[in-house]
Amino acid sequence: MAMTILASILLAASAQALPPATALPPPVTDAATVLAPINAVFAAFEAGDAPAVLRHVYPEGRVTATGTRASGSGLRHQSWTQFAERLKPGDGFQERISDPAIEIDGDVAMVWAPFVVRVGGKVSNCGYDHFDLVRDNGTWKIMNLTFSSRTAGCPAQ
């Protein structure tokens, strides 16, 4: 009896709680295919090519930006068409993301990444991009983009 109790105590003492489960990183090929429309949209931003942006997004999607504005609220919503209409060729706009976190579940994906925007080679603003994407007929497209934006504390300022 004493041996059974001792064995039970030792077994309980040696048991450890498992760490929380974390998702496995997506296979490299899946990550690359999810990032492809994002990279294409950034290239279209740089070229000021609104039609190219619209080829990689769902028209019913939205762009939502947060950040402090002089006028008060920093929350802005636009359709992809409204957002793309603001692009101008040759304005020197360049956006880069780094260290994207990519989550994929079937035909839905999410990309979260810090970004820096340069205009004419100078840092303009930075923040975080959150893209949600949907795959239809084997093609990933961006449904929505939500991003934060600040002008201070940006890398390389």
Language-model segment annotations:
Residues 18, 74-124:
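Surface-exposed, charged secondary-structure patches
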Residues 52, 62-64, 110, 141:
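General beta-strand recognition
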Residues 110, 126-153:
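Short beta-strand edge/turn micro-motifs at domain boundaries
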Residues 16-55:
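Short, low-complexity N-terminal intrinsically disordered segments enriched in polar/charged residues
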Residues 2-14:
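Bacterial N-terminal signal peptides
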Residues 48, 58, 97, 106-108, ...:
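Extracytoplasmic
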Residues 57, 115-117, 146-148:
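Short beta-strand segments enriched in hydrophobic/aromatic residues
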